[in-house]
Amino acid sequence: MAAVVRFEELRRPGGYALLTLAVAGGYFGAGRLGLLRELVVDGAVFTPIWPPTGVAVACLLIFGLRVLPGIALGALLVIMSITSLHPTVFVILVGNTLAPACAYLMLRRVGFRTDLGRLRDGLALVFLGALSAMLISATCGAGLLVLTDRLAAHSFWPVWLGWWVGDAMGVLIVTPLLLLLRTVRLPLDLRRWKEALGLAAAIGVIVPLVTHNRVSLLFLIYPLLIWAALRFRFAGSMLCALFASVMATVAATQETGPFADLTHVEVMMKLQAFNGTMAFTALLLSAVITEQRNTRISVENACQELAEVLEHLTAGDPRQGGRP
């Protein structure tokens, strides 16, 4: 028994170190993906969607605060990959680590469920996990640029807004996908597969077309989003929102389609408004549909139990000697 205890004691630190490295690697990989598409406003570079914030919040919700060192390590690796280390950089590191931690604490405070089965869970993720908590990282990052004279004071708010929305978008799109990845089940019905393939084909054709067309047709994506939410709930709607946001970001960084002939600030505002409303609609619509489905299942189960009770009352319970 003592040998087993010692083995477990040796195993736990190793497992924790592996978890920390995995979280750091996931954060760093998501950061490198996010840096593939950048926008420049008044000389400051930021990403319209910053996936590492979504990875960080999801890891905290799944594993708890013990993964915070992994998040900090991943953030440090991302910073080291784009700039040299100096004392002021650690302010950004603190902001990038503290924002997901605050998101986790606020979500736990209100009883957030990782299955996103209630409308209140979707609202909590939007307003607490994304919009409120990411104020920290945006303020630390943009504020540091101003204090170090790398950004003019009059440019603070545009850069701060872009930073804030980019971090929030990472939470709104990436976090739900990672949380649902543990519970999603592929449809076994052939008809469901056919519908899923048809929806994917429609999205694959229409979304690139409208995001790269100079005529403003972005609204055509919303029927596809509603279809995905109604039939496939979170798995369908969030994947649709992610693909649409990525394609819109590509068009915006290339200044093509509906983002052509616009200033950098106008491109940022239009892109962030589209991405934000897309993610918000997908998340809340799927939450409402899932909650209604769970309510219907609960009512059906209650009716079934009531029918069984009535059957015992009218026919008699054989275990108590009753006769029909």
Could you describe each region identified by the protein language model?
Residues 1-48, 54-150, 175-243, 250-292:
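Short helix-perturbing small/polar motifs within transmembrane alpha-helices
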Residues 153-157:
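Juxtamembrane helix-entry segments on the extracytoplasmic side of multipass membrane proteins
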Residues 158, 162-174:
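Alpha-helical transmembrane segments that form the membrane-embedded catalytic/substrate-binding core
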Residues 285-288, 292-299, 303-306, 310-313:
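Heptad-repeat alpha-helical coiled-coil signal-transmission segments
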Residues 310-324:
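Cytosolic, intrinsically disordered low-complexity tails and loops
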